[in-house]
């Protein structure tokens, strides 16, 4: 079994429980700030800014705005991929995919208190994580999802159970998760749920987050 990273203690599991990943295209004309603010009121515990279509200047501006929004609530901001933006805005975390900067290089660049998440798409990735300074693993995708199509076939619940048996590192499940399947994903071994369209596309992100948070807290 892969053991937890020496840095894993820096990530409180509670902060990973309901993890919003932004997607402006799902927001239905609303600003990201409006969606995030509503979701925070509903109980989101972590927010990842993932807007790959933005140029560096706009991405940084969005990151700074979200950090200001989240700070009074003590909710960590995670930056997807962009180490430079994470450093510039003082983000609390960074999430890296398989094609992003290698984790070991990112760790050298980031302050020790900044936590790192890493997406895993195969059991080989999970095994490799034992040698990496990662604080949580993003298991992606659990179910098929239209918000991210450049991935391998979905893990499914049994795949998630296999990952849980293979590692003690905290697991955040993402991909096609909603109120109808959230409980079974948690019971399969996820420590937290990352959601995109379930909140960003919701008519009322506050109510949607509240429903998810109630399910999570009941498990």
Swiss-Prot record:
Q: Which reaction does it catalyse?
A: 2-[(2R,5Z)-2-carboxy-4-methylthiazol-5(2H)-ylidene]ethyl phosphate + 4-amino-2-methyl-5-(diphosphooxymethyl)pyrimidine + 2 H(+) = thiamine phosphate + CO2 + diphosphate; 2-(2-carboxy-4-methylthiazol-5-yl)ethyl phosphate + 4-amino-2-methyl-5-(diphosphooxymethyl)pyrimidine + 2 H(+) = thiamine phosphate + CO2 + diphosphate; 4-methyl-5-(2-phosphooxyethyl)-thiazole + 4-amino-2-methyl-5-(diphosphooxymethyl)pyrimidine + H(+) = thiamine phosphate + diphosphate
Q: Name one GO molecular function term.
A: magnesium ion binding
Q: InterPro entries given for it? A: Aldolase_TIM, ThiamineP_synth_sf, ThiamineP_synth_TenI, TMP_synthase
Q: CDD domains per the record?
A: TMP_TenI
| The organism's place on the tree of life at top rank | Bacteria
Pfam families with a match to the protein in the record: TMP-TENI
Q: Which residues bind 4-amino-2-methyl-5-(diphosphooxymethyl)pyrimidine?
A: 48-52, 80, 119, 148
Instruction: Give a yes or no for keyword Cell cycle in this entry.
Output: no
Give its E.C. classification number.
Answer: 2.5.1.3
Q: Which pathway, metabolic or otherwise, does it act in?
A: Cofactor biosynthesis; thiamine diphosphate biosynthesis; thiamine phosphate from 4-amino-2-methyl-5-diphosphomethylpyrimidine and 4-methyl-5-(2-phosphoethyl)-thiazole: step 1/1
Could you say which cofactors this protein requires?
Mg(2+)
Q: Which positions are annotated as binding Mg(2+)?
A: 81, 100
Task: List the GO terms this entry assigns under cellular component, sorted alphabetically.
Answer: cytoplasm
Q: Which GO terms describe its biological process?
A: thiamine biosynthetic process; thiamine diphosphate biosynthetic process
User: Where, in this chain's numbering, is 2-[(2R,5Z)-2-carboxy-4-methylthiazol-5(2H)-ylidene]ethyl phosphate bound?
Assistant: 145-147, 176, 196-197
- What's in the keyword line of the UniProt record? Magnesium, Metal-binding, Thiamine biosynthesis, Transferase
- According to the record, how does the cofactor bind? Binds 1 Mg(2+) ion per subunit.
- Disulfide-bonded cysteines: none
EC primary class: transferase
Which Gene3D superfamilies does the record associate with it? Answer: Aldolase class I
> Family per UniProt?
Belongs to the thiamine-phosphate synthase family.
Q: Its function?
A: Condenses 4-methyl-5-(beta-hydroxyethyl)thiazole monophosphate (THZ-P) and 2-methyl-4-amino-5-hydroxymethyl pyrimidine pyrophosphate (HMP-PP) to form thiamine monophosphate (TMP).
What is this protein's record name? Answer: Thiamine-phosphate synthase
State the encoding gene. thiE
């Amino acid at each position: 079994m892969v053991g937890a990273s020496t840095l894993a203690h820096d990530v409180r599991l509670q902060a990973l429980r309901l993890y919003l990943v932004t997607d402006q295209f799902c927001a239905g004309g609303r600003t990201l700030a409006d969606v995030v603010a509503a979701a925070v009121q509903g109980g989101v515990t972590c927010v990842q800014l993932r807007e790959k279509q933005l140029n560096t200047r706009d991405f940084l501006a969005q990151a700074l705005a979200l950090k200001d929004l989240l700070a009074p609530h003590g909710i960590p901001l995670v930056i997807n991929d962009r180490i430079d933006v994470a450093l510039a805005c003082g983000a609390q975390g960074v999430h890296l995919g398989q094609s992003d900067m290698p984790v070991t290089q990112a760790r050298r660049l980031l302050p020790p208190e900044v936590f790192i998440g890493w997406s895993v798409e195969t059991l080989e990735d999970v095994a490799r994580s034992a040698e990496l300074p990662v604080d949580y693993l993003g298991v992606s995708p659990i179910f098929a999802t239209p918000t991210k199509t450049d991935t391998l076939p979905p893990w499914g619940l049994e795949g998630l159970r296999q990952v849980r048996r293979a590692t003690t590192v905290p697991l955040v499940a993402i991909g096609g998760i909603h109120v109808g399947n959230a409980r079974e994903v948690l019971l399969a071994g996820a420590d937290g749920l990352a959601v995109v369209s379930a909140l960003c596309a919701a008519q009322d992100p506050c109510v949607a987050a509240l429903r998810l948070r109630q399910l999570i807290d009941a498990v």
